[in-house]
Amino acid sequence: MTITGIIAEFNPFHNGHKYLLDQAEGLKIVAMSGNFMQRGEPAIVDKWTRAQMALENGADLVVELPFLVSVQAADFFGQGAVDILDRLGIDSLVFGTEEVLDYQKIADLYTEKGAEMEKFVKNLPDSLSYPQKTQAMWKEFAGLDFSGNTPNHVLALAYAKAVAGRNIKLHPIQRQGAGYHSVNKDVDFASATALRQHQKDQDFLERFMPSVALFEQASKVIWEDYFPLLRYQILSNPDLTTIYQVNQEMAVRIKEAIKTAQSVEELVELVTTKRYTKARVRRLLTYILVQARENVLPEAIHVLGFTEKGRQHLKSLKGQVNLVSRIGKEPWDAMTQKVDQIYQLGKPSIAEQNFGRVPIRIETN
């Protein structure tokens, strides 16, 4: 049987995600971000709600990406997620993208010339941002051009790099309907960005979200809910360079900007430069919010939920893969668990995220 992996945030889960799961074959394993997203923002609803949405709409098994995989630039995000899915035995990776190319060929190219390609990136001037360097590399070695707004394509290339040399086939699915950042309401498939923006528009949600009741019942947060905490962390920390990935230049800019910024968005605007993209600045602010430090990634994989089919697969992995289904006295990943406690501070109504929580079981699919 085919075992298909999907890397996702489901922030929130919408019809485009359901379409992706419908297109996937065999047993479907989702490696999903926890409570903070790749581009450095809190999830609109918590990881358990999002895992349940996925399980109700075609996923067989949902596992959690640790914080230091979730909140990373595309390459590290892709690498960390593929590592986890590889250990869970996937033989194909399905993903949505704006550009359907022969990503398999790109993965093979990276298998062959990876060292040379990384050397090329290293030698590019530091005035370029990391995404610009990566794009220059793909242009040079694969002849790829980038139109501005294709974050899923950028992630797809990161997945191609991550599967290089592994026995995993890539299956791109043409992204349906609205673009990633689109807030357009007159489309067949709305983007997660639009759903977050129109979260109080009942008709809109019902049109584009398969698990709308779950979403409506859940506590919802936005970055601004954490702004007072973020300000406190910045103002009270005498040396921001002790925080993961914060260098001297960024520390100075952030300390200066917090004097006048009245919101997270304003802070991001003030700190962003040509070299430091908004997404990168948001990630740094997330690291500061949670006091992130360089840390080893957990050995074990945290299971958020499964169907009967998913449970059978987990049974077959017993003894080969270290799985955690209940976080108790033994932590799974101390960093992620601390992050979840901070996530809960965004709204008093957010439930406990780890202790005593057991995987969600969906009986029928």
Curated annotation (Swiss-Prot):
Q: Any idea where this protein resides?
A: Cytoplasm
State where ATP binds: 7-20, 96, 152, 175
GO biological process: one example: tRNA modification
Q: Which Pfam family is one of those matched by this entry? A: HIGH_NTase1
- Tell me if Ligase is a UniProt keyword of this record: yes
* GO CC terms: cytoplasm
Q: Name one GO molecular function term.
A: ATP binding
Which reactions does this protein catalyse? cytidine(34) in elongator tRNA(Met) + acetate + ATP = N(4)-acetylcytidine(34) in elongator tRNA(Met) + AMP + diphosphate
If you read the UniProt record, what top EC class would you report for this enzyme, in one word?
A: ligase
Main location (coarse class): cytoplasm
Q: Does the keyword Nucleotide-binding apply?
A: yes
Could you list this entry's UniProt keywords, alphabetically sorted.
ATP-binding, Cytoplasm, Ligase, Nucleotide-binding, RNA-binding, tRNA processing, tRNA-binding
Q: Which InterPro entries match?
A: Rossmann-like_a/b/a_fold (IPR014729), tRNA(Met)_cyd_acetate_ligase (IPR008513)
EC nos: 6.3.4.-
The job of this chain, per UniProt, is described as: Catalyzes the formation of N(4)-acetylcytidine (ac(4)C) at the wobble position of elongator tRNA(Met), using acetate and ATP as substrates. First activates an acetate ion to form acetyladenylate (Ac-AMP) and then transfers the acetyl group to tRNA to form ac(4)C34.
Return the similarity comment: Belongs to the TmcAL family.
What name has this protein been given in UniProt? tRNA(Met) cytidine acetate ligase
